[in-house]
Amino acid sequence: MQLNTIKPAEGSKKNRRHVGRGIGSGLGKTAGRGHKGQKSRSGGFHKVGFEGGQMPMYRRLPKRGFVSLTRRHVGQVTLNDLAKINLPEVDLLVLKAHGFAGEQINAVKVIKTGELKIAVTLKGITATAAAKAAIEAAGGKLVELA
């Protein structure tokens, strides 16, 4: 085998369709679009959700609920994450700066996954009962903001 003799597998390469290049090609004149009608015209095709004049599905179904603009987006942080930060005081801004809370998160809860061996003071952050016990056992504390 030599580089100049290598060929692709039979049937793996398919030629592109060249439409509108004469009747002998089989795709000339109407270019595979048929005669007349909306689909044959340039730019002529229905929009997404259009069902040919029938009442579309998105209008047949009732509206449900609403999106609250004041919803609390609560993120989860583990004890392992707090150990990785390795700072004496941690609040929401610190968690966001270290990538443990996303942009839309406006509250965080600590869950007990892993271990915490350093004393950490959490400001304005809630924790589960088990996580709170682990934080206090390591010499840390939770401070609630008023």
UniProtKB/Swiss-Prot annotation:
InterPro entries: Ribosomal_uL15, Ribosomal_uL15/eL18, Ribosomal_uL15/eL18_sf, Ribosomal_uL15_bac-type. SUPFAM superfamilies: Ribosomal proteins L15p and L18e. The keyword Amino-acid biosynthesis does not apply. Keywords: Ribonucleoprotein, Ribosomal protein, RNA-binding, rRNA-binding. Transmembrane segments: none annotated. GO terms for cellular component: cytosolic large ribosomal subunit. Residues 1-51 are annotated as: Disordered. Residues 21-31 have a biased composition (Gly residues). GO terms for biological process: translation. GO terms for molecular function: rRNA binding; structural constituent of ribosome. It comes from the Bacteria. The keyword Acetylation does not apply. Belongs to the universal ribosomal protein uL15 family. Binds to the 23S rRNA. Part of the 50S ribosomal subunit. This is Large ribosomal subunit protein uL15. It comes from Polynucleobacter necessarius subsp. necessarius (strain STIR1). The gene is rplO.
